[in-house]
Amino acid sequence: MNDSFKTKTTLSAGGATVSFFSVETLAKEHPEVRTLPYSLKVLLENLLRHEDGRVVKREDVLALAKWDPKAEPDKEIAFHPARVLMQDFTGVPAVVDLAAMREAIVAMGGDPARVNPLSPADLVIDHSV
């Protein structure tokens, strides 16, 4: 991780210390961040946390920090969810796809453990089976 904006900080509470990336610290240099909708601040924190100079670049953070709701979007940004929550209607086909890919890897003599989601995923079954 790059942390080119120097936003990584710590918080101590209850005897534990955690690290996080402060959107408020970024706002000191880029005050327009304070006017972003909350949902975009969450996305901005995600970019700060994953800035690596390759997939998430400094320019990506600045593009979102300077977001103008009236402007036509001209840049895609990366999003790295901490986890994915899937309802059974969409989750079951994804699990079936993963199983099929693992079977295909085994049939080709490969290691099925190489086929895994990049983000943790939870499958919620919202009815009785």
Residue map of PLM features:
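Fe-S-dependent hydro-lyases/dehydratases of central metabolism
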Residues: 1-129
